[in-house]
């Protein structure tokens, strides 16, 4: 276990996990660098950690720390300068009938049912398609930072999508989103656009989208939200030519 001097947390320590199978690149082994102890990571500390390329899963705050791979790149959208492309504008128009309801984290059988249908429909065999209620709650409903749950419902009140968002000092961090896998249109794209609009409303400059991987189809959508910054070599910067 070691302390990282470049991070401004005298009381936090950072350690590397043992290797485990990579969730995104088949055949690869991954490691994570974990910030601990978790109870010291409040909203302010977490905002600074996100600026250093970290994100969280439940109470687990981490960033990639693989031995021979740097494929996972933290990315964030410049919300003030963002301009949607044609397909994004179409997704935005196509879901204008949805209403968003922002709430505190709370258990809901309706949410869990939608989560289960989403995992089974979009990520079958991915390991999360049989998550128990406890696993779901630990993953999405457990937080020590400033987190919100957003419901999206249609005109009849039917739940179409749920998004979990962390509110940071300089932006929003998109934690996880799940939606009706049978729905038409690009609900995932609409969700990111909605979060960008929320950043603008709150005068927050950045929307953090987690990690982008060039060779992962699951991550490809993130490169479409421009201008995008990448966290490379310890600093946020514009994508080098040919990166995206």
Swiss-Prot record:
One GO cellular component assignment for this chain's record is: cytoplasm
Is Transferase tagged as a keyword? yes
GO BP annotations, alphabetical order: ubiquitin-dependent protein catabolic process via the N-end rule pathway
Question: Which reaction equation describes what this protein catalyses?
Answer: N-terminal L-glutamyl-[protein] + L-leucyl-tRNA(Leu) = N-terminal L-leucyl-L-glutamyl-[protein] + tRNA(Leu) + H(+); N-terminal L-aspartyl-[protein] + L-leucyl-tRNA(Leu) = N-terminal L-leucyl-L-aspartyl-[protein] + tRNA(Leu) + H(+)
The alphabetical list of record keywords is: Acyltransferase, Cytoplasm, Transferase
Q: What is its main location?
A: cytoplasm
Q: Has keyword Cell membrane? A: no
Instruction: Report a single Gene Ontology molecular function.
Output: leucyl-tRNA--protein transferase activity
S-S bridge residues: none
Enumerate the subcellular locations listed in this protein's record, separating them with semicolons. Cytoplasm
Recorded hits in InterPro entries, A to Z, give: Acyl_CoA_acyltransferase, Asp_Glu_LeuTrfase, N-end_Aminoacyl_Trfase, N-end_Aminoacyl_Trfase_C, N-end_Aminoacyl_Trfase_N
Q: What domain of life does the native source organism fall in?
A: Bacteria
Q: What is its EC number?
A: 2.3.2.29
- NCBIfam families in alphabetical order: PRK01305.1-1, PRK01305.1-3, PRK01305.2-3
**Record HAMAP family:** Bpt (MF_00689)
UniProt lists the family membership as follows: Belongs to the R-transferase family. Bpt subfamily.
**Function in brief:** Functions in the N-end rule pathway of protein degradation where it conjugates Leu from its aminoacyl-tRNA to the N-termini of proteins containing an N-terminal aspartate or glutamate.
Q: What name does this protein carry?
A: Aspartate/glutamate leucyltransferase
Q: Which gene encodes it?
A: bpt
